[in-house]
């Protein structure tokens, strides 16, 4: 009797297991078919009773650029691009493009780069100057820049202020106030961006950080550095130094050097200079009509010049070529390269790849927002940066100011005059420095960790005109080593 009961129990258990396995098998087939159907995408509404769980990507992971359209092979470093909000509630968004160092480690510094303007895109800095790629003449393919600054650092390119490049605001009030509060608002937005970006990329919080830029970034860079210093007790940022090229620092001193530069480079006559001095500068002989005529005569000579590099050719035909030019090299400046970049960044495929223009802005990407540039506060433009530079140096922040020697917009002599206005003690006298045995320019060191550097054969955008010199200057600065003083 007991054996019969045991057999009955055993039979029931086996029968239960058999039925359960059949149910599981059928269920598995059903699920498999659903998955297969969803992959095939027959266009019909699917069965929503089955949901595949997916891991939610972090903002950093979403910003990862898998590959740039037209990117050459052999790229080993990671790239990111995306938007970071800079106010609450979020209406202002700054766009960034970030390239990790080619050979990164946990101590590789972070460099933040700004172009000037005001309101010129730092993507110009990325793809025309110091980034890892340049754009071919067809506006579709890229080629490598072997002298990219990510040979030495992780480089973050920030499009600032808002409405520059892909950066935007959804609040019209922001745009109305920006022209009036340009410098102050921009510095605040840049700081908030950095704080929010470091939350997205926390591995860089303890890194050495440098801020760099050119032209009107002579305002952006010191002003952002000043905010960092003022707020470092609350949120520590390991700011080590600032590097500014051909910078706007003090217009009252720098502006008059333009005509002197033209005269010394054979771009105007001595008589034209004498007329200008007589009718425009002397109170006893000032004549408004004659002054205006004098200025017009001189300025007419600029029409056929690239004032950012007086020895560079000008772009005569920016028509994109179907076949990219052969033997393209960063050592040859193509005067139409801005047009190639504009065509490249306005391709929908490119914007999707770099996570830009996600809100479908009603205008195309341009290298500068000319409307904002023209409406920028004159008071801001004329504000001297000397007091901020003194403050930063007093806090132990190293400063390097470099200037191309063929820039008419901000001549090197005008920048040197600003440095002299700072009344610093010279530690090492004006002397030559070299790259590969060739003269790279001249340099002078001052007490308080300020270095001034001229760059031979470079204009307003030093990394474009002299990429090897620019990389050597940058490397020297972040390694805190002197530029080579022997050939």
Swiss-Prot record:
Keywords: Carboxypeptidase, Disulfide bond, Glycoprotein, Hydrolase, Protease, Secreted, Signal. GO terms for cellular component: extracellular region. Its EC number is 3.4.16.-. InterPro entries: AB_hydrolase_fold, Peptidase_S10, Ser_caboxypep_his_AS. It is found in: Secreted. Belongs to the peptidase S10 family. This is Serine carboxypeptidase-like 37. It comes from Arabidopsis thaliana (Mouse-ear cress). The gene is SCPL37.
